[in-house]
UniProtKB/Swiss-Prot annotation:
TSP type-1 domain segment(s): 196-241
SUPFAM superfamilies from the UniProt entry: FnI-like domain, Growth factor receptor domain, TSP-1 type 1 repeat
The protein, known as: CCN family member 2
Keyword tags: Cell adhesion, Disulfide bond, DNA synthesis, Extracellular matrix, Heparin-binding, Secreted, Signal
Keyword Signal: yes
Residue span(s) of domain VWFC: 99-165
Residue span of region Heparin-binding: 245-347
Amino acid sequence: MLASVAGPVSLALVLLLCTRPATGQDCSAQCQCAAEAAPRCPAGVSLVLDGCGCCRVCAKQLGELCTERDPCDPHKGLFCDFGSPANRKIGVCTAKDGAPCVFGGSVYRSGESFQSSCKYQCTCLDGAVGCVPLCSMDVRLPSPDCPFPRRVKLPGKCCEEWVCDEPKDRTVVGPALAAYRLEDTFGPDPTMMRANCLVQTTEWSACSKTCGMGISTRVTNDNTFCRLEKQSRLCMVRPCEADLEENIKKGKKCIRTPKIAKPVKFELSGCTSVKTYRAKFCGVCTDGRCCTPHRTTTLPVEFKCPDGEIMKKNMMFIKTCACHYNCPGDNDIFESLYYRKMYGDMA
C-alpha cells in the first residue's frame, strides 16, 4: 500500500518543485526563461542562476546595482548590500569585509596602500581599489602671454606639465580654449586632523554611465572609528533619451549645461522619486570635447516602488559642467575613473 502511494506522491512532489513560484523581487509566478541559449558573459564575469532559481544570468560586478533577482558574482566574494533591512529592493554589489584585491598580477590585503604608478596612490578596501592622483590637476586658462596652454609629458618626469603653444592661425580674438577642470565635490578636507585620525577621502569616481542612472563611488575614513569605508551614490550625467545636439546654437560647437524644460522624476529599477527635481545635466560637443560634471553635491532622494515601499538613496546633483579636450585614453584605467569619455557605455 505504501509502495503504491509513494510513486504518485513522488511524482506530485517533483511537479510541485518544477512549477514552484519564484521568490525574490520581480520574480514571476512560474519560471520563464528566454528561449535562446544562456547569455554570453564578458571575460571574468560568472554565469550564475538568478535569485529566482530559474534562469542563468551574467552576475553583477562590484559597484553595480543588484536586486534579489539579479545577484552579484559569488565567485568574487560579492554580495548585494541593500543598506538597511527595510530596503530589500535595490542594492549595490559589495565585497565581503576583509576581501583582498588583485591588481596588476599582485594581491593586496584589505587596508593596504600601494602606488600603482608614479601618478596614483591606491588603497585596497574589501576587494575594491580606490586611487587618488599624485600629480597636480591645476587649471591654466588662456591668457595673452599663453593663449594656447596644453599639458605635455616631459622626458624624465612622471607628471605632465603645462606648455604654451603658438597659434597656427592668428586672429584678432583667437579661438577660446575650453579649460579642463577637475570635478569639484563637497566633502571633508583631506588634510584635516581629528583625534589621532588623518581624514582622507578620495574623489568621487566618474559616473558609471554617461547617460541614464549610474553609480559613483569613493573611499573615506571620515567616520567615528577612522576606518576606511566605501560610499556610493546614484548619478545621472544626462538623460539617454535627450537629443542634446539639437540644442546647440548656430555657430557653436558645444552646449555645456542644457536647460531642462520641466522638472523631472528619477526612475530606478521600477521605482520613482517621490519629488520632482529641476536637475541640471551636462551637455555634448560636436568637436570631440567631453562635457563632464565640474561642481557637484550629494543629496538624499526618496524613491517609491510599485508595492508602496519607500527607499532612500544618496544621489549626485550637478551644479556646473565643463567641456574640455582632456578626455581619457582607452589604455589608462585610472584616468577613466575620473575623466571617463562621454560615449561608448558598456552595459
